[in-house]
């Protein structure tokens, strides 16, 4: 994945580097860093492949243009024995931030989820994803969605005016490393 992404970046004039190291299970791993508007970002197409908990048609952006703080020494460990890659500390091109899917507090996160469920139901999109600023907020919104059943309220409200009626049949999927929550909707 990482070599292919590097090739695609090269073909399109996007400055990039292949980063090697290990993952959180000490297995060899490679990912890219790419330069967007003068800033470097981590990009891991391997870990954004929808394998496992997600349907094959789902496009994740968990590891798309993320900072070192989000992944280094958590899930990605750089082998910097021979070189030190540029720091990746910018956030402005991050997918969720760039598309208004980022929240810095619980109320904003819940409001985003509610509006994204409505948008998804109108367009028959089966997926909602947002990013939050802390693990506490991630846990708080998950509790609100599941324990307090807010997710069902949001779906019911969306279905009142949506072009397509949706339902939720699985619990939201959390990625505590990059602070994202994913909701799958069925039609």
Question: Where do the model's predicted regions map?
Answer:
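N-terminal accessory/pre-domain segments preceding catalytic cores
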Residues: 66-187
